[in-house]
């Protein structure tokens, strides 16, 4: 593990963090090669998270769109309502193994914060979550969930008051409390070894989906579609298909109010190579290399960077990345709810929206898998507000 995907990745961190990061790499490698650790992890995935999650044939949607067969990988059915617990559980288990008494995490939509607080409660560790002040407001329900689970939530008032600033605050805390604290990063980002750790704990999604589609259809899918913020749900489903050249991988970013406006989070579509949060990757930045704010209706996608392995897949042309606007995502949110009785997270709705455009252009014997990364309970308020604003002609 040299921590590079082509030129992307690396460890752009202060000297004070290098020891902790090196220790983490050593301990992680020991853990994943330790049968006892992996058995314990798999036990909790099955009995606590509720894996495996179904691969569901979306018959109504398929008929209605009149093209490819659409399958949904139901990560929304995991305990805590998204794919996030796959990773939080693995990392908190690792923290416990390393003898750390306290875990910290950053969170945007609040899903990773809830997942980390959940795992910390399960394994008896102290938990503190950093969240941008704006996200605290947007995701009040998740903030309360974290507090119920015994976590302390810090509202971060700096920069844009969103995920990027929460990560900065969490990294500062980690530097200060390195001896007793483990930093649970929520996506395939940050300095090496984090992108690999998170990918290894999320690839269960794609491993299951690959087996399930072979069982259901006797062959691999033509397309796998997933939303991309930092990129962990997408990397989790993409990774086991990377070697299958016939499977097209499509990551869907947030186009916000449009990629030709400054109000979007389409890092791979509109960004350029730079350094953020300890890694070299695509970032949204100005001519001077200053990070520009990311925006999306979905709190989980408004990140101005992206996991380095996604940057690598883009450059190698192994995956392609598209962008979907707030409006299209909101439409897809309602569409899936009405057609299949499944309320998706606004993040996942971006993937659904792209698949709604893709499927009708394909033949009836082609297969599309959408990673439904989370459920939409947390977003009902946001959607309600948007519908009211549209009614009032805003």
Curated annotation (Swiss-Prot):
- Give the matching SUPFAM superfamilies: Tryptophan synthase beta subunit-like PLP-dependent enzymes
- Name the cofactor(s): pyridoxal 5'-phosphate
The catalysed reaction is: (1S,2R)-1-C-(indol-3-yl)glycerol 3-phosphate + L-serine = D-glyceraldehyde 3-phosphate + L-tryptophan + H2O
> Entry's PROSITE patterns?
TRP_SYNTHASE_BETA
Can you supply one Gene Ontology CC term for this chain's record? cytoplasm
**What's its EC?**
4.2.1.20
Q: Which CDD domains match?
A: Trp-synth_B
Residues modified as N6-(pyridoxal phosphate)lysine: 84
MF terms in GO: tryptophan synthase activity
Q: In which pathway does it act?
A: Amino-acid biosynthesis; L-tryptophan biosynthesis; L-tryptophan from chorismate: step 5/5
Keyword DNA-binding attributed: no
Lyase: present as a keyword of the record? yes
Q: Sorted alphabetically, which keywords does the UniProt record give?
A: Amino-acid biosynthesis, Aromatic amino acid biosynthesis, Lyase, Pyridoxal phosphate, Tryptophan biosynthesis
Family indicated by similarity: Belongs to the TrpB family.
Q: How does it assemble?
A: Tetramer of two alpha and two beta chains.
What does the function comment of this entry state?
Answer: The beta subunit is responsible for the synthesis of L-tryptophan from indole and L-serine.
Name of the featured protein:
Tryptophan synthase beta chain
């Amino acid at each position: 593990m040299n921590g590079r995907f082509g030129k992307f990745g690396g460890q752009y961190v202060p000297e004070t963090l290098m020891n902790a990061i090196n220790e983490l790499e050593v301990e992680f490698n020991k853990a994943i090669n330790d049968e006892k650790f992996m058995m314990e992890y798999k036990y909790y995935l099955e009995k606590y998270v509720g894996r495996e999650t179904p691969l569901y044939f979306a018959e109504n949607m398929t008929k209605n769109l009149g093209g490819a067969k659409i399958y949904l990988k139901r990560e929304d059915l995991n305990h805590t309502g998204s794919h996030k617990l796959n990773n939080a559980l693995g990392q908190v288990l690792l923290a416990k193994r390393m003898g750390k008494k306290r875990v910290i995490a950053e969170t945007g939509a609040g899903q990773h914060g809830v997942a980390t607080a959940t795992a910390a409660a399960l394994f008896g560790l102290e938990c503190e979550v950093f969240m941008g002040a704006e996200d605290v407001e947007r995701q009040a329900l998740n903030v309360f969930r974290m507090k119920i689970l015994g976590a302390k939530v810090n509202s971060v008032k700096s920069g844009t008051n969103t995920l990027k600033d929460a990560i900065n605050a969490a990294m500062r805390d980690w530097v200060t409390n390195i001896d007793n604290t483990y930093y649970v990063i929520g996506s395939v980002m940050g300095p090496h070894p984090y992108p690999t750790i998170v990918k290894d704990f999320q690839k269960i999604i794609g491993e299951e989906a690959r087996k399930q589609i072979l069982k259901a259809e006797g062959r691999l899918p033509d397309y796998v579609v997933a939303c991309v913020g930092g990129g962990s749900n997408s990397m989790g489903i993409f990774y086991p298909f990377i070697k299958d050249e016939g499977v097209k991988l499509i990551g869907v970013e947030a186009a916000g109010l449009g990629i030709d406006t400054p109000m979007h989070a389409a890092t791979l579509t509109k960004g350029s190579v730079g350094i953020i949060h300890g890694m070299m990757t695509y970032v949204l930045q100005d001519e001077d290399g200053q990070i520009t704010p990311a925006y999306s209706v979905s709190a989980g996608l408004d990140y101005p960077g992206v996991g380095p392995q996604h940057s690598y897949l883009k450059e190698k042309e192994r995956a392609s990345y598209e962008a979907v606007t707030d409006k299209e995502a909101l439409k897809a949110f309602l569409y899936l709810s009405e057609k299949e009785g499944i309320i998706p997270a606004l993040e996942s709705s971006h993937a659904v929206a792209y698949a709604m455009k893709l499927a009708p252009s394909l033949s009836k014997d082609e297969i599309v898998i959408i990673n439904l990364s989370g459920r939409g309970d947390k977003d009902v308020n946001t959607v309600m507000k948007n519908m009211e604003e549209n009614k009032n002609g805003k």
